[in-house]
Amino acid sequence: MRRESSTVVALAGPVRAELLAGLSRSPNISVVGGGAPAESANGQPSGEQDWEPGARAMREAARRRSTYVVVADDPLAGVAAAWRAMWDLNTGAQGAAGFEDQAAQALAAWRGKQFELPDYYLLVPEPAGSAGADLHLGPLRAARPRRVALATIAPADREGAGLLASLRSLEHGPWWPPLDDLLDAARTFFAGGLTETQSYPT
């Protein structure tokens, strides 16, 4: 369990650069992550695992002393993408295998104390028509409803006002269960039961 004085909030979803820039200008808010993927010495992608950018950002967030530290990289990003793909009927058995691979990598890193989960996940709305099965709105929110929130962001918002208001509305709740319990819950969670979407309002 995290014990730092700052509240660490990880953003999930398509985060526009101007929203992060707007947040970074707000008093008592630090923004971490959201940069380009890491490259190797020859300028090619480094081949790092999907949890690593989020883990680095979470470690950096732990060193900040702002009231809120907003993290634009999620250590569970690979798990979330694989969970969504698993519900795509076109992927077949490969979808489930991909999820298990990502889950094993993230769980090993978490057990190795490479990262901890943020205090909260704040979901950035996706463009209408592109939303699908979502790990955060599904099994994670079912496990800890007050640890996952859907941001209210208008498409015309360029300064992060919606994100800022969403940060201030977060409610305290029980801490996360162990990551292996969350992953087990994801294996049995029925994505078709989701009643809330994460699309922009029309």
Predicted region positions:
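Short catalytic/ligand-binding loop motif for oxyanion handling, primarily in non-cytosolic enzymes
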Residues: 18-19, 77-81, 130
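NTP-dependent small-molecule kinase module
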Residues: 2, 15-16, 127-202
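Short, well-ordered beta-strand core segments
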Residues: 69, 120-123
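Glycine-rich phosphate-binding loop used to anchor ATP phosphates in small-molecule kinases
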Residues: 46-116
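Hydrophobic anchor at the beta1->P-loop junction of P-loop NTPases
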Residues: 11
